[in-house]
């Protein structure tokens, strides 16, 4: 068990209730992500409680509404995949970088597919998911602009064609 030194320099022990709350919260988020990964686009609170091995009331106490679980999913995915998007290119020429971009995205898209399908299903009811998708679109667009010798403003048709070919939506159709 860990202990903290409080501001008045006395030794304090962590509160057991807070530890249980954090533990059950982590179990619920993990169960939610597992259910989506397994193909359940809209897991119910009952499914989550069963998978997390917690009571249904615990799910509702930790997450007053399901929207909060989708927020957790988005945050988790951003934390996992942002480093991959920000990783420097191994090569310097455009063709090789485009090939590397395609390889990275294909791996990422396969990992993201169940989560992205679930978030697409819920985005029309969630301002947060809509904002997260818009942010992600800007990130991947900037990623592509850093490779190409032109940008969306200078060559909109060509840029949009390449962007569409490399998009998650196109990958999903394959």
Language model: regions and residue ranges:
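Basic, helix-initiating cap at the start of DNA-binding domains
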Residues: 1-42, 46-51, 68
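Amphipathic alpha-helical linker/stalk segments
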Residues: 11, 34-43, 50, 71-101
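Generic detection of well-ordered alpha-helical segments
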Residues: 18, 22, 26, 30, ...
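Solvent-exposed, amphipathic alpha-helical segments
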Residues: 27, 31-38, 84-88, 161, ...
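DNA-binding alpha-helical recognition surfaces that contact promoter or target DNA
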Residues: 30, 61, 71-72
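Short hydrophobic/aromatic patch on the recognition helix
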Residues: 54-63
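Short linear capping/connector segments at secondary-structure termini
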Residues: 85-90, 119-127
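Amphipathic alpha-helical packing segments from all-alpha helical-bundle domains
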Residues: 107, 111, 117, 125-160, ...
């Amino acid at each position: 068990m860990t202990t903290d030194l409080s501001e008045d320099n006395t030794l304090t022990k962590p509160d057991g209730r807070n530890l249980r709350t954090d533990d059950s919260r982590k179990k619920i988020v993990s169960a939610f992500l597992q259910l989506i990964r397994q193909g359940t686009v809209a897991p119910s609170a009952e499914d989550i409680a069963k998978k997390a091995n917690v009571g249904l009331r615990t799910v509702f106490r930790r997450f007053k509404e399901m929207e909060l679980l989708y927020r957790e999913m988005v945050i988790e995915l951003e934390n996992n995949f942002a480093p991959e998007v920000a990783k420097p290119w191994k090569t310097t020429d455009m063709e090789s970088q485009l090939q590397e971009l395609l390889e990275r995205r294909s791996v990422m898209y396969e990992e993201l597919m169940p989560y992205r399908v679930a978030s697409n299903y819920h985005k029309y009811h969630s301002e947060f998911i809509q904002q997260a998708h818009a942010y992600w679109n800007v990130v991947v667009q900037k990623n592509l602009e850093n490779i190409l010798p032109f940008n969306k403003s200078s060559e909109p048709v060509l840029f949009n064609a390449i962007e569409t070919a490399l998009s998650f939506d196109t990958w999903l159709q394959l």
